[in-house]
Amino acid sequence: MSDARADEDWEYWMKYSFNARVNEKVALFIKPQFRWRDDFNEFYFHRTWAGATLKVLKWLDVAPQYSYKTSKHSGNHWPPENFLALDLIPKIALFDLKVSDRNRVMYGLDDYVWTYRNRIKIARPFKKALWGHGLTPFIADEGFYNDKAHEFYENRAEFGFGTKIIKNIELELSYIFRSKEKKDKWIKSHILCSLLKFKF
């Protein structure tokens, strides 16, 4: 897809999260993601994260993980990419708000590039809303930096809400405004995102 078509494009990102609790401090997870672009018409991206979340302190989670990614290139070529990553996620409660600050360091095993991602999320749970299923509106912002570009090269501003469908299944719907630098030009896109969470 050309840069002209890519700017102001609409995309759909479909995400899943499968979490299996080992004990009070350890949970294993697998998180597949799929993306469509060109006004939802072209499937172009898949990524799966797999790892563990460790509750190191009451206010701090640490998550070592591996990621497999493939995306569509010219000629319908889908080269695989592999990454190792570590998340450090401090969390605090501020009045009725829940605030988290995910700091992710990624290393590309194929291109040897280090990437740092920072995502700050603020959520306000309403536990009795939707007939007891609960409703949690949130806003978030995530910035990207890597040692190849040596600069901040992408930002995602997001707002949405989450709710519990049944006891172990939650749904999150959101809108993301993404700005990404490409050839000294900032390409903007509008993203509709769904996240289905399964907890075991």
Tell what function each PLM region has.
Residues 5-61:
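Start-of-domain marker
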Residues 5-8, 24-25, 59, 93-99, ...:
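Short loop/turn motifs that connect adjacent beta-strands in outer-membrane beta-barrel proteins
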Residues 5-13, 36-45, 73-80, 107-115, ...:
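Solvent-exposed loop/turn segments connecting transmembrane beta-strands
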Residues 20, 54, 90-92, 124-128, ...:
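Residue-level signature of outer-membrane beta-barrel architecture
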Residues 28-30, 62-64, 97-103, 135-139, ...:
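Transmembrane beta-strands of outer-membrane beta-barrel proteins
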Residues 32-38, 66-72, 92-94, 105-109, ...:
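Transmembrane beta-strands of outer-membrane beta-barrel pores
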Residues 85-88, 188-200:
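Outer-membrane beta-barrel "beta-signal"
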Residues 90, 98-143:
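Detector for outer-membrane/organellar transmembrane beta-barrel domains
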